[in-house]
């Protein structure tokens, strides 16, 4: 254990030594800096990533959602109307029509109220480390001091 401790102390001293036969840099070489100027030109082709937000995708998605809602409501009306009709229609086996019943949830207009929450005294301790990890760190430090 003592050998490892000494090796850890001596290694930076050995590695940080300067040797006489090394090539030294001149002051002019040390401060010589090359400047490179470049410009970034964006490439607009079909395969590159476009970082602009295209809102038309969102608008078309909203339109599709609206149309889907309109179709489901009209299908529901047709389903209820056809269930009350007295005559039967022939089914076309090549073009089956499937209808889904539409269920709607009642909309409440009551305001949502939340109760004021009082701060808990244990909230301050939740940001600290758990006592197990603190105890483990303390035992490791005590063990390290004991072996030195």
Curated annotation (Swiss-Prot):
Keyword Mitochondrion on entry: no
Signal sequence segment: 1-16
Region described as Disordered: spans on this chain: 91-125
Keyword Membrane tagged: no
Major site of localization recorded for this protein: secreted
A GO CC term attached to the entry: extracellular region
Bias (Low complexity) ranges: 96-116
Glycosylation sites recorded in the entry for this protein: 50
Compartments in which it is found: Secreted
InterPro entries per UniProt: DUF4634
UniProt KW keywords: Glycoprotein, Secreted, Signal
Protein name: Uncharacterized protein C1orf54 homolog
Organism for this UniProt entry: Mus musculus (Mouse)
């Amino acid at each position: 254990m003592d050998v490892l401790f000494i090796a850890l102390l001596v290694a930076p001293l050995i590695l940080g030594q300067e040797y006489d036969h090394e090539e030294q840099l001149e002051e002019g070489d040390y401060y010589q800096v090359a400047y490179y100027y470049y410009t970034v030109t964006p490439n607009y082709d079909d395969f590159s990533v476009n970082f602009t937000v295209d809102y038309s995708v969102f608008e078309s998605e909203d339109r599709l959602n609206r149309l889907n809602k309109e179709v489901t409501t009209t299908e529901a009306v047709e389903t209820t109307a056809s269930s009350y009709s007295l005559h039967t229609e022939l089914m076309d086996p090549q073009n089956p029509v499937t209808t889904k019943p539409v269920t709607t949830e009642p909309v409440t207009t009551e305001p949502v109220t939340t109760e004021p929450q009082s701060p808990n005294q244990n909230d301050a301790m939740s940001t600290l480390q758990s006592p197990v990890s603190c105890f483990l760190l303390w035992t490791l430090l005590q063990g390290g001091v004991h072996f030195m």
